Each structure stands twice: as structure tokens, then as C-alpha cells.
């Protein structure tokens, strides 16, 4: 197959843990031909969604993370529907530029491209708001533009988490308690004087045991979660915020949440999702660029990238040579 990855610059990948790298490596090992482009390079020419693609191949040892790992060939312009699969792996934030990219991906799908995850699915599933579709699994939550409502929510629950709807990697997340002397200042900064919508949730003490990432691939739940355990004094378990990743078996509650969401995600055209769970509560549904493949594979000997590429091959109607 010819597979196009829409991703951030490959030279910036941390190959020892990067999930997109793991996907690429697995696809390359199977003999697929790989191409890379940036989301900002998507264009429409004569009605056709196109981009500047760069063919690349792997070089060096698989476990050599200290030297160059790829070599590129001459870039060229190509329509997205000329590839067997297009894998969208651009990191958030989900800003207007990201929105435009998903709209172009939807147009490309209408022209016959196989895009994972679909542009429509990424638009429909805001990674924070998506949990509201599953109220049976979430902690007390409000979404509001008004600081006064957050203060009332804080008064009721005494200890809360507030976060923007378009963040990633734990950026912009604050823990507030009723005794915090900086409540007004924090809300003014985060909510921009009642002009920015945020989410507030009751604080979940189980965060000290880890913010668990549960992966769902084409409706199949990976049997291990990556618990991202915060540093001492932190309330954010995100790896980007310094959290430590520990792969562990799913609990009964984890399975209940994941098994409920999995068929709905598949129905919505979401090939890969990352469910974030703290304790017994679902906190996010990540559909833009979920991570955790390498940590789970290394710690539990469960090949997540193979499961993912299997799913891509199925949806692209690929049949390996006998």
C-alpha cells in the first residue's frame, strides 16, 4: 500500500516513545510505501484535495534513537485520493487551522480518499466535550463561559479542575480549591474575562494513581492501559507535563467504560481513540493524535502498532501477497 502520514515534522519525533513513529515503522516493516506531509500543506487545486508529499524510508537500526532514522526522496504534488490510506497524526491544539484541515480531509474522503481518523469524526468529537455523550461515566461537570458559574461550582464541590476545551498535554489545566487566594486571577486568565468557554470538573483524588490512557482501535479495546502518574506535587499526569507512564491491565471499570464506547466510536468512523480515565471516571476522548503505543508494547509485550496497521489494511481492502 501507499500510505500518507499527515504529521508534524519527522525530524522532531522522539523516536523512543513516539506513536506515529511506531505506526510508520510497522507499516514499513510490512513493505508498505510511506509518504509524509504537513497539515498546512493541504491545498485544493481544480477541486481536488492535494498536498506536497515527501516519500521516505527508514535507515539505521530500529532501536537506535540517537541518529537519523529516515531518508527522503524528492517531494511531489499528489491528490489524497491516490493513496491507499491517509493517516492524520497532527498534534493538537484543535484550533481554526486544524478545523480547516479536517474540512479538507472530509472533502478528500468525498473524492475517494481513505482517511483515518475521518475529518468529520475529529470535528464531532471535541476531546473534552465528547465525554458529555456518556454521562454515566463522568464526574460532576459543567461547561461555561462565565466565571461566576465556576465559582458556584467550586463552592459546591470545594475542589475542582478547570481546563480549556482546545488544549493538549495538560496545558492550561488548573486545580482550584475554595481556599485558593488566586481564584479570580486564574479565572480571568483562563476564561479571558468571560469570553472563553471552559470545562470544570470535580477533582478526582485517584489522579495520584495515574491518568489512564485506554486505546480503542477499530472497535477493539487494547487490554492494557497506560497509567500516566503525576510527579510529586502535580495534578496532571500527562507525559508532556512530566508524568511517568506505567502500562497495566484494565480494571473491571476500565473495561465497562471502554466496551461501552468502542462500538459508538467505530460507528462514528473513529479508527483510533484514546480514552482518558481517572479512577472510575472518563475524563477525555482523544481522537486527533492518541499516544501510548510504544510504552504499552515495551512494558506488556502487546504490539499495539501491529493491531493498528491491521485495521488500516482492513479498511483499505489490502490483501497481503500469499
Predicted segments with their positions:
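Short glycine-rich anion-binding loops that position phosphate/pyrophosphate groups of nucleotides
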Residues: 9, 91-93, 165-167, 290
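ATP-dependent carboxylate activation and anion-phosphoryl transfer catalytic cores
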Residues: 6-7, 13-16, 249-322
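Phosphate-binding site of ATP-dependent enzymes
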Residues: 19-20, 147-148, 155-159, 169-255, ...
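Conserved N-proximal alpha/beta basic substrate-recognition cap immediately N-terminal to
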Residues: 11-13, 17-29, 35-140
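Extreme N-terminal starter segment of soluble prokaryotic enzymes
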Residues: 1-4
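Short glycine-enriched loops at secondary-structure junctions
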Residues: 119-123, 228-230, 278-281
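Short acidic-hydrophobic, aromatic-tinged amphipathic segments that line or gate anion-handling sites
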Residues: 141-145
Amino acid at each position: 500500500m501507499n500510505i500518507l502520514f499527515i504529521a508534524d515534522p519527522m525530524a522532531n519525533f522522539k523516536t523512543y516513545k513516539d506513536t506515529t513513529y511506531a505506526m510508520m515503522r510497522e507499516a514499513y516493516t510490512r513493505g508498505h510505501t510511506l509518504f509524509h506531509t504537513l497539515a498546512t500543506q493541504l491545498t485544493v487545486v481544480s477541486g481536488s484535495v492535494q498536498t506536497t508529499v515527501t516519500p521516505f524510508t527508514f535507515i539505521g537500526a530500529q532501536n537506535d534513537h540517537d541518529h537519523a532514522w529516515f531518508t527522503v526522496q524528492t517531494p511531489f504534488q499528489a491528490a489524497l485520493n491516490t493513496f491507499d490510506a491517509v493517516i492524520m497524526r497532527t498534534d493538537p491544539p484543535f484550533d481554526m487551522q486544524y478545523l480547516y484541515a479536517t474540512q479538507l480531509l472530509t472533502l478528500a474522503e468525498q473524492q475517494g480518499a481513505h482517511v483515518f481518523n475521518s475529518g468529520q469524526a475529529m470535528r464531532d468529537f471535541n476531546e473534552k466535550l465528547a465525554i458529555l455523550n456518556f454521562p454515566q461515566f463522568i464526574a460532576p461537570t459543567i461547561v461555561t463561559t462565565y466565571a461566576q458559574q465556576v465559582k458556584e461550582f467550586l463552592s459546591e464541590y470545594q475542589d475542582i479542575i478547570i481546563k480549556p476545551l482546545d488544549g493538549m498535554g495538560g496545558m492550561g489545566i488548573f486545580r482550584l480549591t475554595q481556599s485558593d487566594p488566586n481564584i479570580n486571577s486564574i479565572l480571568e486568565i483562563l476564561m479571558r474575562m468571560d469570553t472563553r468557554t471552559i470545562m470544570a470538573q470535580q477533582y478526582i483524588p485517584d489522579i495520584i494513581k495515574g491518568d489512564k490512557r485506554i486505546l480503542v482501535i477499530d472497535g477493539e479495546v487494547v487490554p492494557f492501559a497506560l497509567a500516566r502518574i503525576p510527579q510529586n506535587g502535580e495534578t496532571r499526569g500527562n507525559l508532556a507535563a512530566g508524568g511517568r507512564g506505567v502500562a497495566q491491565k484494565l480494571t473491571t471499570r476500565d473495561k465497562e467504560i471502554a466496551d461501552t464506547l468502542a462500538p459508538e466510536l467505530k460507528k462514528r468512523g473513529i479508527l483510533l481513540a484514546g480514552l482518558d480515565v481517572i479512577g472510575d471516571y472518563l475524563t477525555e476522548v482523544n481522537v486527533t493524535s492518541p499516544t501510548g503505543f510504544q510504552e504499552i508494547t515495551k512494558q506488556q509485550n502487546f504490539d499495539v502498532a501491529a493491531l493498528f496497521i491491521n485495521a488500516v489494511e482492513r479498511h483499505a481492502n489490502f490483501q497481503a501477497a500469499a
